[in-house]
Amino acid sequence: MSSRSSSVTHEAAPPTFKESFLFPLSTPNARRDLIFGGTCLLILPIGWILNLGHRLDVVYRIYHDQAPYYQGFKPYGHTLLRGLKATTAICIYLAPSLICASLAHVHSIAALWFVAVPLFVLATYVLPGGMTYNAAFHDISYLYRPDRAFARAWEGGTDYLWAWLIALSAILISFLGLLALGIGFLYTSVWAWMVVGYVFSRALSLRRPDGR
């Protein structure tokens, strides 16, 4: 696969379950990063933030065809900063639903639950769109503009829904790691989120949003 200009649309075939599930295990570098990422989770929340930053770097390399896609977590400062920005974005996206849920609970306003739940579902649905475009183009506006993320998710159409199906399946499978004395979940959860990063980087059209 040749390198491509970031201004060119990347029309990727929808990823399959098999390729998506195997991608985080496909190379020695990938397996090394998975093991390191899982071990990092022992130092929460820093480990979780590092994994998030690492995942965004991998998404960038997938789009720009910069193999090997898995190049470790160094420099740690860069990876941590990128993860912190993405963590802030998650908080921004989920804030409206969490505020409504808190008010509903504290003041016993049942009607607010009918606002909080849809807002939570919508925010969760569009987050991968925003994260993917931020990762691919270093466009930080997607981290604080849920409306732009929604536009990308909508643009993704059925491919975006297909990516969600694979992603949710991987997340559910990751809970099998709890059977390995619980500690296995550290590694299966990292595997699942590596799958998530891969499927959304493949499924979205990834058209550079210049002037939009």
Protein language model features and the residues they cover:
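Short, small/hydrophobic-residue-rich motifs at membrane-helix boundaries and re-entrant hairpins
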Residues: 2-29, 36-68, 72-124
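Interfacial aromatic "cap" segments that immediately flank transmembrane helices
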Residues: 18-41, 73-99, 125-176, 202-212
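Intrinsic structural disorder
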Residues: 1-3, 171, 182
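Selective recognition of hydrophobic, aromatic-rich stretches within alpha-helical transmembrane segments
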Residues: 41-64, 105-144, 175-211
